[in-house]
Amino acid sequence: RTCLISPSSTSQTCPKGQDICFTKAFCDRWCSSRGPVIEQGCAATCPEFTSRYKSLLCCTTDNCNH
């Protein structure tokens, strides 16, 4: 599997066993001026959604986390 990896949003091959791509958006203390922080990467399971996330996308095709 290949996924986009933050901070550069470049496509990289995921480690063995990490077949899920994800994109998380969440607010930090600068959210009102800079917008949400975006994290992209690979995972073995979809990260658990928490109340601090604005959005969470998990997908299973190459580079689907754009």
Swiss-Prot record:
<feature type="disulfide bond">
    <location>
        <begin position="59"/>
        <end position="64"/>
    </location>
</feature>
<dbReference type="InterPro" id="IPR018354">
    <property type="entry name" value="Snake_toxin_con_site"/>
</dbReference>
<dbReference type="GO" id="GO:0090729">
    <property type="term" value="F:toxin activity"/>
</dbReference>
<dbReference type="InterPro" id="IPR003571">
    <property type="entry name" value="Snake_3FTx"/>
</dbReference>
<dbReference type="Pfam" id="PF21947">
    <property type="entry name" value="Toxin_cobra-type"/>
</dbReference>
<feature type="disulfide bond">
    <location>
        <begin position="3"/>
        <end position="21"/>
    </location>
</feature>
<dbReference type="InterPro" id="IPR045860">
    <property type="entry name" value="Snake_toxin-like_sf"/>
</dbReference>
<dbReference type="InterPro" id="IPR054131">
    <property type="entry name" value="Toxin_cobra-type"/>
</dbReference>
<keyword id="KW-1015">Disulfide bond</keyword>
<keyword id="KW-0528">Neurotoxin</keyword>
<dbReference type="GO" id="GO:0005576">
    <property type="term" value="C:extracellular region"/>
</dbReference>
<keyword id="KW-0008">Acetylcholine receptor inhibiting toxin</keyword>
<comment type="subunit">
    <text>Homo- and heterodimer; non-covalently linked.</text>
</comment>
<dbReference type="GO" id="GO:0099106">
    <property type="term" value="F:ion channel regulator activity"/>
</dbReference>
<protein>
    <recommendedName>
        <fullName>Kappa-flavitoxin</fullName>
    </recommendedName>
</protein>
<keyword id="KW-0800">Toxin</keyword>
<keyword id="KW-0629">Postsynaptic neurotoxin</keyword>
<feature type="disulfide bond">
    <location>
        <begin position="14"/>
        <end position="42"/>
    </location>
</feature>
<keyword id="KW-0872">Ion channel impairing toxin</keyword>
<keyword id="KW-0964">Secreted</keyword>
<feature type="disulfide bond">
    <location>
        <begin position="27"/>
        <end position="31"/>
    </location>
</feature>
<comment type="similarity">
    <text>Belongs to the three-finger toxin family. Long-chain subfamily. Kappa-neurotoxin sub-subfamily.</text>
</comment>
<feature type="disulfide bond">
    <location>
        <begin position="46"/>
        <end position="58"/>
    </location>
</feature>
<comment type="function">
    <text>Postsynaptic neurotoxin that binds and inhibits neuronal nicotinic acetylcholine receptors (nAChR) with high affinity (IC(50)&lt;100 nM). Is a selective, and slowly reversible antagonist of alpha-3/CHRNA3-containing and some alpha-4/CHRNA4-containing AChRs.</text>
</comment>
<dbReference type="GO" id="GO:0030550">
    <property type="term" value="F:acetylcholine receptor inhibitor activity"/>
</dbReference>
